[in-house]
Structure formats: C-alpha cells, structure tokens
Amino acid sequence: MDTRYYIVMVQDYGEVYEYEFPDLYRARYLMSVEQLPCSLWECSPQSSNRRLLDSRNATRKLAI
C-alpha cells in the first residue's frame, strides 16, 4: 500500500501555508493554478522525510 502524501507549500507575504493532499494529481492541480510562490513535496510518514518535486514562481516578485 502506498502511504505517501503530498504537500504544497505556498508563500504569501512572509507566511508559509501547507496544503496536504493524498494524491499527486490534486497537489499538481493546486500548483498549476496558484499564482504565489509555491513548492510541491513528496512525504513519507514512515521516515518523516520530504523530497522536493517541483518549485514555481520562486523568484517572481508581485507588484503591490
């Protein structure tokens, strides 16, 4: 049984929000529609390790 889960971390004005998903499809969907800097992580509950899968808009600055 695959027990991996996925987290999308979204950065907004100094705050970081984590959204947990049971499957990669839903996590990638949030990554595709999110306008703020975000990253996608694969997580293993057995080892508590995270592996970076994708990072978007990391260097993009939004005008206020």
PLM regions with names:
Residues 1, 28-33:
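Short linear motifs in intrinsically disordered
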Residues 16, 33-64:
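Short, mixed-charge low-complexity intrinsically disordered segments
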Residues 1, 11, 22, 48, ...:
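Intrinsic-disorder/low-complexity regions
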Residues 1-16, 45:
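Short aromatic-glycine-(Arg/Gly/Cys) micro-motifs in beta-strand/loop hairpins
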Residues 13-29:
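A short, exposed loop/beta-hairpin motif centered on an aromatic-Gly-Thr core
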Residues 7-8, 21, 27, 40:
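Hydrophobic beta-strand residues in large extracellular and virion-surface proteins
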